[in-house]
From Swiss-Prot:
Residues 862-886 are annotated as: Disordered. ATP binds at residues 86, 104-108, 499. This is Protein translocase subunit SecA. Keywords: ATP-binding, Cell inner membrane, Cell membrane, Cytoplasm, Membrane, Metal-binding, Nucleotide-binding, Protein transport, Translocase, Translocation, Transport, Zinc.
Length: 906
């Protein structure tokens, strides 16, 4: 019934596109008049549009004329005229939606339309790409159009100094990678003045390859971190022990990607740990004193049994480097968290780096939701449309192709074993190679690509391998994959964003030429050669794309298919599968094996059957659904931290903007003074119950006040009067500092101390949240909702953090001291500037431009010791307690508050 209705009325997508086509006529009707304009008149249109916006017009009032202007500018500057379908794509992007356009349909050119229009407001537009190469390429090629029309263009790539970045972000249109944008946002919120920040307020972003960034990378948070402790030796010891375990000692679930020790495994590993003197004899791995070891053992088990070298990671130059499962690219600078990376380093016998503590983090989900207006483009988004709508409130519209797709997608071939599958793939590659038809072979891992490469080497078939190991050559190799007799093996979607042109890409070959020797003649020769090869390739059938396995996501399979048949070119695609493939083995083996038995599969034979294709699609949908729920669950938890992050970042900005820091200082001084007095002199208590001794100690610790016991000797003195006296004494101490150091220095110092203290307690808080997240799922066993428990406890931790902030801030301000012996009074304000400069330089350490920023946060203030989860504290070992709040019960088990027990002398 539904299919009949769709045929009668069309889908919602069809109706949207039809409506957009009617709008395109308005743009086309303006073209004759725009064509008559001189270059100068065309450029002046930008000034005219800005004036209209200033006088109250909206972007929608000028959208058709602005698009017509960009189309004409592109034609004059680049020799490219936007097709009608590209104009539709531009309207979709301008309206804050995602446009799905096939490979080769010119998405890069499409982005110029909404980018130009929205940049007219002067608030900036970010065009987001997945790597530095594409950011540079697109800003250089499309920047010519923007510059012609009088707009400025910036490009952001890794490793740029702040002043260069700031200028690029202040441009009308900025091309940047998603990673750099996210990290610059985090780094900006660790800066100490607004002038040091590089980003402007969020306005409008256009994300290229939007599915890759908002879906594939959604589960990977951006983290700036620093090392916390050195347990390298312990990781090494545990690794050696885990290698001695038997297969019966643990159980693993490949679907859920979990691994656990069995009862026999626990007994076995306990004996091994005891033998190595890591645990005491006759104690259990799960005894309180040994609980921290469980984490090390679990991560070592995962490293050895759930992670494979050259599939999940590779080892390069003595470092373990993560491979992106969707693109096959190395994720430069990223490290697995929670000790997993250290476990992998121990497994591969390379230098074990310190574990890291989070200093700042954000997911792409929450970063991109900061933009008031967001849009994106990709060749494959319809399969993920529900998720994009649910999480980002982005609708997806599929735009028809300019030329009819002539590519032929052949049925899958299923074989009984991997060897039979490879034999069939080799036969097809040989046939295509002999007739000159270019072939692109897609694999799901480096290991598989190198395995296939070795087979082709034995058969003496020339080929190129494109995977994470050759990232630098990625764009060039993929661009030439359409040449006559070319055979290219690519890991997943490596080279995405670069078109495969039949016959080859002449521009990239020309870039390699030496301009000093016969340059023009060589250019002409290359163009003639490419034109000839294009004819030969078209006669041979175009690009043949071979998939060696189905991916977990249908979208990734569609991306691979989409490399062939660009702009109406001929081409073919075909997937070869076997029962040994991961997807078949883990998710669809039982169902498909039954079908194959019914059909009677023989050795070397391939099966083509719609029932198998449907079973595979169901398996993929099941995995996609599972991954979607994981991303959604991550977002639910991350939203808790995101709400807190927004509060902290907003407060930080307010502090930086503040011209008077005394307001917070005075209110906090009064609040803490009252709190301390009432702690030792409770309301309604008898005078003999007042603890004047400890009141004096506490006032000196917090305010540096030397409290005179005679103040309370009067018979009629009240708690309120003593509180007022304490507050006045604190104000007097601060006033004396102003007289000694100058009001300007103290104002700046208070602001600086407040910022550094906020950073310290926030870092500490993130560490506590990390610990909370790691164990919160276990609450489900107690019939409690982990998310509700996480929200409740995270709120409590946040309140505790704010209390710690106040106490540490006040304590530091009132103990703040500059040695004036060798400093003239008129130069004292320079001391603060020097202090501030040192802080800024430590934060701008080159390590901070890396994903894993290293320990570059240092101040002249006493560092705050990290908070430790209470269950990880050893009552007999104060060094294991971390920082303990003064009003907490002492971890030693005495039942006293910490400040009256082990913390009495602090």
């Amino acid at each position: 019934m539904l299919s009949i209705l769709k045929k009668l009325f069309g889908t919602a997508n069809d109706r949207t596109v039809k409506k957009l086509f009617s709008e395109i006529t308005k743009i086309n009707s303006l073209e004759p008049a725009i064509q008559k304009l001189s270059d100068e008149e065309l450029k002046n249109k930008t000034v005219e549009f800005k004036e209209k916006l200033k006088n109250g017009a909206t972007l929608d009032d000028i959208v058709y004329e602005a698009f017509a202007v960009v189309r004409e500018a592109a034609k004059r500057v680049c020799g490219m005229r936007h097709f009608d379908v590209q104009l539709i794509g531009g309207l979709i992007l301008h309206r804050g939606m995602i446009t799905e356009m096939r490979t080769g349909e010119g998405k890069t050119l499409v982005a110029t339309l909404p980018a130009y229009l929205n940049a007219l407001t002067g608030k900036g537009v970010h065009v987001v790409t997945v790597n530095d190469y594409l950011a540079r390429r697109d800003s250089a090629s499309m920047g010519k159009i923007y510059n012609f029309l009088g707009l400025s263009v910036g490009c952001i790539v890794g490793g740029m100094p702040d002043e260069v970045k700031r200028a690029a972000y202040n441009a009308d249109i900025t091309h940047a990678t998603n990673n750099e944008l996210g990290f610059d946002y985090l780094r900006d919120n660790m800066k100490y003045s607004l002038q040091e920040r590089v980003l402007r307020p969020f306005n409008f972003a256009i994300i290229d390859e939007v599915d890759s960034i908002l879906i594939d990378e959604a589960r990977t948070p951006l983290v700036i971190s620093g090392p916390v402790n050195d347990n390298a030796e312990l990781y090494g010891k545990i690794d050696k022990i885990v290698r001695l375990l038997n297969a019966s000692d643990f159980e693993k679930d490949e679907k859920l990607k979990t691994i656990n020790l069995t009862e026999t495994g626990i007994t076995h590993i306990e004996s091994l740990l005891s033998k190595e003197s890591i645990i005491k004899p006759d104690t259990s791995l799960y005894d309180f004193e040994n609980l921290t070891l469980v984490h090390y053992v679990n991560q070592a088990l995962r490293a050895h049994n759930m992670f494979t070298v050259n599939v999940d990671y590779l080892v390069r130059e003595g470092k373990v480097m993560i491979i992106d499962e969707f693109t096959g690219r190395v994720m430069e600078g990223r490290r697995y968290s929670e000790g997993l990376h250290q476990a992998l380093e121990a497994k591969e016998n390379v230098k074990i780096q310190n574990e890291n503590q989070t200093l700042a983090s954000i997911t792409f989900q929450n970063y991109f939701r900061n933009y008031p207006k967001l849009s994106g483009m990709t060749g494959t988004a319809m399969t993920e449309a529900p998720e994009l709508k649910d999480i980002y409130n982005l609708d997806v519209v599929a735009v028809p192709t300019h030329n009819k797709v002539t590519r032929l997608d052949l049925d899958d071939e299923i074989y009984g074993s991997k060897k039979e599958k490879y034999d069939a793939i080799l036969k097809l590659i040989r046939d295509c190679y002999d007739r000159g038809q270019p072939i692109l072979v897609g694999t799901i891992s480096i290991e598989k690509s190198e395995e296939l490469s070795s087979v082709l080497n034995k058969e003496k078939i020339p080929h190129k391998v494109l995977n994470a190991k050759f990232h630098e050559q990625e764009a060039f190799i993929i661009a030439q994959a359409g040449r006559f007799k070319a055979v290219t093996i690519a890991t997943n979607m490596a080279g995405r964003g670069t078109d495969i042109m039949l016959g080859g890409n002449p521009e990239m070959l020309i870039e390699q030429l030496d301009k000093a020797h016969n340059y023009e003649a060589k250019v002409a020769e290359i163009k003639a050669q490419i034109a000839e090869e294009k004819k030969q390739v078209i006669e041979a059938g175009g690009l043949f794309v071979i998939g060696t396995e189905r991916h977990e996501s249908r979208r990734i399979d569609n991306q691979l298919r989409g490399r062939s048949g660009r702009q109406g070119d001929p081409g073919k695609t075909k997937f070869f599968l076997s029962l040994d493939d991961d997807l078949m083995r883990i998710f669809a083996s039982d169902r498909i094996s039954g079908v194959l038995r019914t059909l009677g599969l023989k050795d070397g034979e391939a099966i083509h059957h719609p029932m198998i294709s449907r079973s595979l699609e169901k398996a993929q949908q099941k995995v996609e659904g599972h991954n979607y729920e994981m991303r959604k669950n991550l977002l639910r938890f991350d939203d808790v931290m995101n709400d807190q992050r927004k509060i902290i970042y907003e407060q930080r900005t307010e502090i930086i903007k503040s011209k008077d820091s005394h307001g917070f200082l005075n209110s906090t001084t009064e609040e803490l003074a009252q709190k301390i007095v009432l702690t030792f002199m409770p309301v309604g208590s008898y005078r003999e119950d007042w603890d004047i001794e400890n009141l004096s100690v506490e006032l000196h610790r917090v305010f540096s006040i030397k409290f005179d016991h005679n103040v309370v000797s009067k018979n009629d003195v009240t708690e309120e009067e003593i509180t007022k006296t304490v507050i006045q004494m604190a104000h007097d101490i601060y006033k004396s500092k102003e007289e000694a150091y100058s009001s300007e220095l103290m104002h700046n110092a208070v602001k600086y101390i407040l910022l550094t203290t906020l950073d310290q307690v926030w870092k500490d808080h993130l560490y506590s949240l990390d610990h909370l997240r790691q164990g919160i799922s276990l609450r489900a066993y107690g019939q409690k909702d982990p998310l509700s428990e996480y929200k409740r406890e995270a709120f409590n931790l946040f309140e505790q953090m704010l209390n710690n902030l106040k106490e540490l801030f006040i304590q530091t301000v009132y103990h703040f001291h500059i040695d004036l012996k060798n400093v003239q009074k008129e130069d004292v304000s320079l001391e603060y500037k020097k202090l501030q400069k040192n802080m800024r330089e430590s934060r701008e350490d080159p390590a901070f431009s890396k994903y894993n920023a290293g320990s570059s946060i240092e101040t002249d203030l006493k560092p705050v010791v990290s908070r430790i989860d209470p269950k990880d504290r050893n009552p007999d070992d104060p060094t294991s307690w971390g920082r303990v709040s003064r009003n907490e019960l002492c971890p030693c088990g005495s039942g006293k508050k910490y400040k009256y027990c082990h913390g009495a002398n602090e």
